[in-house]
Amino acid sequence: METNDNTDGIEVEVAADSAPTAALNGTEPTKGVKREKSAEAEESDGSDIQPVSKRRRKASVKTSPAVKEQSTSPKKPESTKPKVEAPSPKPAVPKPSDVTPEEKSPSVEEEEDPLESEDEDDLKPELAKKSIEKFQAKLQASGKDPYPDWKAGTPVPYAALCTTFSLVEMTRKRLEITDHCSLFLRQVLRLTPADFLPTVQLMINKLAADYAGIELGIGESLIMKAIGECTGRSLAVIKADQREIGDLGLVAAKSRSNQPTMFKPKPLTVRGVHEGLLGIAKVQGHGSQDKKISGIKKLLSAADADTAGKGVDITKDKGGPSEAKYIVRFLEGKLRLGLAEKTVLVAVSRAVQTHEAELAGNKIPSAEEMAAGENIFKSVYSELPAYEVIIPAVLEHGLFKLPEVCKLSPGIPIKPMLAKPTKSITEVLDRFEGKEFTCEYKYDGERAQIHFVSPDSIHQYPGAVNTLQKDSKGLSSIFSRNSEDLSKKYPDVLGKLDTWVKPDVKSFVLDCETVAWDTEAKKVLPFQQLMTRKRKDVKAEDVKVKVCVYAFDLLFFNGEVRSFVFLAHISQRFAESLFLSSPS
C-alpha cells in the first residue's frame, strides 16, 4: 500500500496562505475522468458532487389585461392595428379571474419547494429571517400550551406525530413545513422530553445513525403479505389495490379502516413504534421473514384504533393522519413528505431554543438568536452526525454549549464536504479572485475515512468501542462517504496501519481515496477494477485487486480536531507527524 497526499472529489478548495500540494512519495498521480457510474458504483461510493437544486419558476399575476414578452431589442412605435401574436412556447399567464389559489404569485413561504430544494443553506438571509419571524408569531399566537394532545410525562402518542406528518404532507411550502415540525417538537420537549430522540429519528425516517448499519431490509412483497394477513384481505386484492392506488401506505390505510375490531387495541406510542421497527430491523437468521411479518402485523393491528372498521376516504387529504399509512411508508424507506433532514435540523434547533427560553422564564428568542442557534446546531451535526449523542447532550447542557461537549471523535464518521459544480474554470477563478486556493487531483476511486485509536488511548473514546474493530493494535475502521463500514472490504488496508503510522500516534481520522493499483506498473487502475473486490468476508491474503490509499485531509489527530485547519497547512505538516519516513 502506498500513501500519497492528494485529493478527493473536491476539485477546488479554498485555503489561505497555501500552495498546491504534492504527493508524499513523489509519484505523479493519474487524473480521474468524469464518467457515468454504474448502479453498483453509485451504491457503494456515490458522487462527491453536490446535486444542483432546481427551482421551479412560477408565473406571477399581473392586473394588466395584456401580457407581453419583454424584449431587449429597441422599442418600436406601437401600431394602432390590433396585433396577432404568435403562440409562445412558454405557458400562458392566466387571467386574474381564472387564477386558482395554487396558481397565485408565490409569497415568501412559497418561494421554495421542499421537493425541489432541500438545502437549507440556499435560503437567502432575508428569507431565513422572515421564516424565523413567522415562527415567532405562531408561538406568540398559540399561547402557553400549543396542541396539548397528551398528558405531561406520558409517552408521545404516535397519532400526534402522524398528525404532524399529515400537516407536512399537505403543503409544499418549506417554511411552513419547518413551522409544523418546530411546534410539534417543542410540544414533545415540554410534555415528554424522554421521547425527543425517537421522535426526531422517526421524522428523518431513520432508526439509528448511518454508521450503525441498521436497515429494515423489507421488500414490497413482504409488506403486502403482512397487510393482507393483518387485515384479513387476500394477497391478490392487496396487489390489485397497489396497482390502482400506487401507494402501499394508502393501501394499508384503506385495508385497516375497513377492518372491524372486537376490542380496541392499546394506542401506539412513538417510542413503541420506534422499538418495534428497530426489532424488525435486527431480526436475522433462519425464519427471519416470518418474524419480520409478525412484527409488522403487531404494529398494524394496533394502528388507527379509532377509525378501524369505519372506512376512510383515502382520496381526501392524501389519506389523512393514518398511522398504518406512515408505518408502511417507513418500512418502505420513503415517507413521501418532502421533509428534508436539514429542515428537521432547523426545526430541532428552534424547538430547543424556545423550550430553553420558556424554562428560564425569558421571552421568545430574537431572530438573530434563533439564527445563531441554528448555525451552531448545523455545525455540530456536520462534525458529529449522531443524534444519539447530540440529542441527550443538548437536553443536558443546552444548545449553546453543544460545541464544547459534542466534537468530532474517532468512531463516528464525519459527513464529507461535497463539491459544488461550476460551468467553467473561468467561473471558479472569478469566484476566487484575489484569494489563494489549493488545487488537487481527482482520483477515480472510493472515498475512505480511516479511524484509529491506539490501545493505550481507548479509554478516552468509550463510544469508539461500539463502532470500531478491535485487535491487538487498537481500534480501527474504514467508513465510506455514506458512513457505511468498509472495514470488511479493506482488511489489507487496516492490516498495514502499523507499517505506515508512527508508533507514538494515539488517534486520528484520515480522509482518503482508495484506488485500484497496479503494483508492477505503479499506476492507478480503472474504477471498475476496484468494484470487483468483494464487499464482505474478505481475507487480506485472498485480495487480488490491490489498492493505493491517497490521503488528502487529516480531520482529527491525537485528540485535536483539525477539520477547520486550512488544507494546505495540514498538507505541509501532517505527513511528518503521522506517517513513517518510508510508507510501505
Pin down the residues of each PLM region.
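N-terminal nucleic-acid-engaging modules of covalent nucleotidyltransferase systems
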Residues: 1-583
